[in-house]
């Protein structure tokens, strides 16, 4: 079974969490793209979705699901999104698709966060995947210096502008033993908009696709 087939299988499993939901949150990425495509069969009961990126918004519109403003939608019942890494505590690194800030906002606005991943994303310790940090452009060099002081090796993701008009620094060589503390420390750096550690608001449910089937992280 290919990695793409695993992603589709775990996306199918997530449908069970949205069958009775009228307005849901939808994330960004290749696994979520499968989930959005599968929503086409359920869209009769879905009144709208709050999306974390322009790319997901366009995909939702193509299957006829209205995209809503979070300010109007209020609290969401369920948010479905993928992750670049996830640990046993359901804490994640996200932001490989540069949508981390909006993903974190929609996750915070949701009662239940369902994370869908294939088994390659499961890790014991976060940090092998470079940690994305969204930064206001004028602060890029300042933030990079502060990230070096934290032990990381930041690399500017050139030719990438977020939906919010900011830039991304991908921080390599971090071993994240205390995700909550690191999330707070990076957020405290002036110029940082958001970082891709999702520990203060971890997932509530993690669905993992593998060749033997889909399992739920206990």
Curated annotation (Swiss-Prot):
> What is this protein's function per UniProt?
Catalyzes the reversible conversion of ribose-5-phosphate to ribulose 5-phosphate.
Binding of substrate occurs at 28-31, 81-84, 94-97, 121
Q: Quaternary arrangement and interactors, per the entry?
A: Homodimer.
Active-site residues, record numbering mapped to chain: 103 (proton acceptor)
Q: List the keywords (alphabetical).
A: Isomerase
Kindly state which reaction or reactions the protein catalyses: aldehydo-D-ribose 5-phosphate = D-ribulose 5-phosphate
**GO-annotated biological processes:** D-ribose metabolic process; pentose-phosphate shunt, non-oxidative branch
Q: Could you tell me one molecular function GO term of this UniProt entry?
A: ribose-5-phosphate isomerase activity
Signal peptide stretch: none
Gene Ontology, cellular component aspect = cytosol
Q: Family, per the entry?
A: Belongs to the ribose 5-phosphate isomerase family.
Protein name, UniProt field: Ribose-5-phosphate isomerase A
Lineage, top-rank taxon, reads: Bacteria
Q: Show the disulfide pairing.
A: none
Upper classification of the source organism reads: Bacteria, Pseudomonadati, Pseudomonadota, Gammaproteobacteria, Methylococcales
Enzyme Commission code(s) on record: 5.3.1.6
Q: In which pathway does it act?
A: Carbohydrate degradation; pentose phosphate pathway; D-ribose 5-phosphate from D-ribulose 5-phosphate (non-oxidative stage): step 1/1
């Amino acid at each position: 079974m290919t990695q793409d087939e695993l992603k589709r299988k775990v996306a199918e499993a997530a449908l069970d969490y949205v069958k009775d939901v009228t307005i849901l949150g939808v994330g960004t990425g290749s696994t979520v793209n499968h989930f959005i495509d599968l929503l086409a069969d359920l869209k009769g009961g879905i009144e709208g979705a709050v999306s974390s990126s322009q790319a997901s918004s366009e995909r939702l519109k193509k299957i006829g699901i209205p995209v809503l403003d979070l300010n109007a939608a209020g609290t969401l019942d369920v948010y479905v999104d993928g992750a670049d890494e996830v640990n046993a505590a359901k804490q994640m690194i996200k932001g490989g698709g540069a949508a981390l800030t909006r993903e974190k906002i929609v996750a915070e606005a949701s009662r239940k966060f369902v994370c869908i991943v294939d088994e390659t994303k499961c890790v014991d310790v976060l940090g092998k995947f470079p940690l994305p940090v969204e930064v206001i452009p004028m602060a890029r060099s300042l933030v990079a210096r502060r990230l070096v002081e934290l032990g990381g090796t930041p690399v500017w993701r050139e030719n990438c502008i977020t939906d919010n008009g900011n830039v991304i620094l991908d921080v390599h060589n971090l071993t994240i033993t205390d995700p909550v503390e690191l999330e707070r420390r990076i957020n405290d750096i002036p110029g940082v908009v958001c970082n891709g550690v999702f520990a203060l608001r971890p997932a509530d449910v993690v669905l993992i696709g593998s060749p033997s089937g889909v399992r739920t992280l206990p």
